[in-house]
């Protein structure tokens, strides 16, 4: 239409309140998610070694929390696959080759379930993942306005959802998913 003007907003200049208004946030927990998302997007937009290490740390920590939750193996596997579908790096994804003793298999194959209902490669999974958990580094999560795209914002939101353990709480997950759909 000739009478329609499109307003293009620079995403990196918007505040938490701006995003809360644009996304029609109705719950305080969603504001906290937006705050964390903006902190992550400014860190991840650098696309450097530190941001990749932090992504690996967040993914590994989320996987560890799911693995040691009180759920059946099939549910744990589904949640881990969900994490790795939404959040992945070259080092942590479903198709990465994980070296074992005398063999190599994809990370996806490590989650096959045996006749006792356990992961066949539970030890291999644990050893591989714990290499990426880094609780010693003090990560800079301060929001610094820097150029990013809506796709970068979506990635940051996905990492926010896994880092806050929202997969483990149905109520929180529902609120977070509503925010994800609006974005």
Regions picked out by a protein language model, each given a short descriptive name:
Residues 1-183:
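P-loop NTPase motor domains
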